[in-house]
Amino acid sequence: MSGKKYFIYKVCATLIVMLFTRASLYAQATSLIEDDGRKVVASVADSLSPLYAQPIEFADTATIEMQPTDSVQKKLRFGKRLINFFFKANTPDPNKRVDFGFLPGPHYSSTQGLGLGIMATATYSMDRSDPTLPRSNASLFSDMTTKGFLLIGLKGNNFFPKERFRLDYRAYIYTFPTNFWGIGYANGNNDDNETNYRRNRVDLMGRFLFRMARNTYIGPMLNFRYIKALEVSPGNMLTLFNGQDLTVHSQTAGLSFIYDSRDFMLNAYRGWFVQLDQTFTPRFLGNDYCFSTTDLTVSTYRKVWKGGVLAGELHGGFNYGNPAWCLMSEVGGNSRMRGYFEGRYRDKNIIEAQVELRQRIKKRHGAVVWVGAAEVFPRFDAMRWKRILPNAGLGYRWEFKQRINVRLDCGWSKNGPGFMFNINEAF
């Protein structure tokens, strides 16, 4: 072997030894031992290179106690905090006023491309001295992809002391390229109708509820929506959009009734949830498309065995009058009929149902399986059995915070599968 090659091999071997030495230091420095009830960093053997450690105390026996340098300690503290954040996030801390956490979520789809979503959640109590007061919650979510999808939103539920009042709110803004098939089941079922366009939307909703009896609330609600369709071909404006405006804004007011006996609203194990919204979008509020809407949701939850919960939901949305193309009832989304392209099937009315079995597998891991069905229709006499849309799927659950799950769902639709990554249970 030539002297040059021998020198190169010697340098490489030296570097490898140094790397393993540093890795060994990190492994030993992070182990903790109990000393008089205090956790201290374990001593590092004095045979390790002083490049990564410094002497801090000399004993009478001439032994040297070593400790990682400040830079190493900072890295260890950061790594420990990061590990604790993910592995102890579901451990409740009664001393925290707000239990907060966030989680990034990379994802990919053929329609949206490669994306990065960031989800954050917080739970808190308006009266910490009252253990019976449900914890309020707020969720912040954002997403962006390589194909031009951009979203940011906030939603939550706030319970005031003694449950006298309840505030539900939702706000989001997004822009993304999407598809449109037209209005009605027949148009949505025709693959040739698929047309591309860009959709911008702003949605603000709030309801302020007064407690009338145990678990029972009633109060006013307001909803502002702004939708704009861009990059639409002139021919599709007439055939698929029925000649309606591509820019729609609506100011809606109404009354909301809620009965909610769920033990925890973000991931219920037992109880009932009934919500009835009667809203009006009249001309005197500045609306070009005038209509009224009755929206009913009934959900129930029941423990069936250890770690198993059976959940069911029935939802109906009924529009009367002249709703715009973008304000009609739609099939699909993150909560119902998962796997369907949101809005492919749309009409004035919808009835949909789903049943889901949720099973905790081990520690923070769980799985779900569900079946569902839906139908959109212009009038009740136009309903047909053959137009019922089937749905089924399964999903993985990871408990990010206590009883707050990150979910990855795969749903099958009449037109193929779809994947969803989100936080909190679907319903």
Listing of model-derived features with the role each one plays in the protein:
Residues 91-101, 107-249, 347, 405, ...:
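Gram-negative/organellar outer-membrane beta-barrel architecture
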Residues 100-102, 136-140, 165-171, 217-220, ...:
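Transmembrane beta-strands of outer-membrane beta-barrel proteins
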Residues 1-76:
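Cleavable N-terminal export/targeting peptides
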Residues 44-168, 244-268, 360-366, 376-380, ...:
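Outer-membrane beta-barrel initiation region
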Residues 104-106, 118-122, 154-158, 204-210, ...:
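Residues on the lipid-exposed face of transmembrane beta-strands in outer-membrane beta-barrel proteins
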Residues 113-117, 149-153, 201-205, 248-254, ...:
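Transmembrane beta-barrel architecture of outer membranes
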Residues 253-258, 262-361:
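C-terminal outer-membrane beta-barrel translocator/porin domains of Gram-negative envelope proteins
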Residues 57-82, 86-89, 107, 168-172, ...:
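Transmembrane beta-strand segments of outer-membrane beta-barrel domains in Gram-negative
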